[in-house]
Amino acid sequence: MQRLLSGSLTICALALALPAAAQVEYPPVPVEKAAYHWPVFSNEHVMVLRVYFPPGRGSNYHIHSLDQISVQVEPGANAGQVWGEEPTPARPGTKGQVSFTAYSKKKFIHKSTNTAATPYQNIVIALLKPKPAGLAPAARPDGYVQVFDNERARGWKLALEPGQSVGPITQSAPGLRVVIDGGEIAEIVSGQPDRGLGLRLGDFYWQEPGTTRGIRNIGTTRIEIAEFELK
């Protein structure tokens, strides 16, 4: 009987210890090493991460230390916790939200978990150069809505209904396009045949400077994209 009681007490002690062991936190990692943060592209200018949290999933503690552009393409609802602080409650994201954060001036350490029944997806563009390279983005015509302009980059959003088009722009600095709502477009370059493109939510494209192009929605659904040029 005494041996049975002793064994039962040991099992209870182990059961109580398991939750504590499960909550052990490892040291923060660089953002590109965090769970559900996948590096998908890099060059001398940028590192692009696809952050994708299925429902109920999230990241471990990680460090943001590079200036960063973010585009939310699937909003989810993330609960977060800053390193050394109390957790913050979940709040729904906003599809299409574009943001810029100067993490090079003050690094940020946190973790987050998607509490929604739908996925969370964020395209993160980390700027690898520590300061501007002296590039100069040009102004864009009506249709492009500027969403930010600072010492590191300039950003716009463009939405087109089926059949709508936007006048040509000449891209004067390197940058990216991120797809918020997919569909079909034609890129129009003078002297060349129109180039049809199928856009998918969360797709991104690196774009070199020097091209003059217009865009027309040739599909049956509204498209929305964000475009950025570096400085």
Regions found by a protein language model. Give the residues of each.
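Glycine- and acidic-residue-biased ligand/ion/polar-headgroup-sensing regions
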Residues: 65-84, 171-191
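Surface-exposed beta-loop interaction hotspot
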Residues: 103, 111-161
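Bacterial N-terminal signal peptides that target proteins for export
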Residues: 1-9
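A short glycine-rich, His/Asp/Glu-containing loop-to-beta-strand
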Residues: 33-61, 65-73, 139-177, 227-228
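Ligand-binding loop in jelly-roll beta-barrel domains
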Residues: 104-128, 182, 208-231
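Short acidic-glycine-tyrosine-enriched beta hairpin
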Residues: 84-104, 193-209
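Bacterial N-terminal signal peptides
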Residues: 8-19
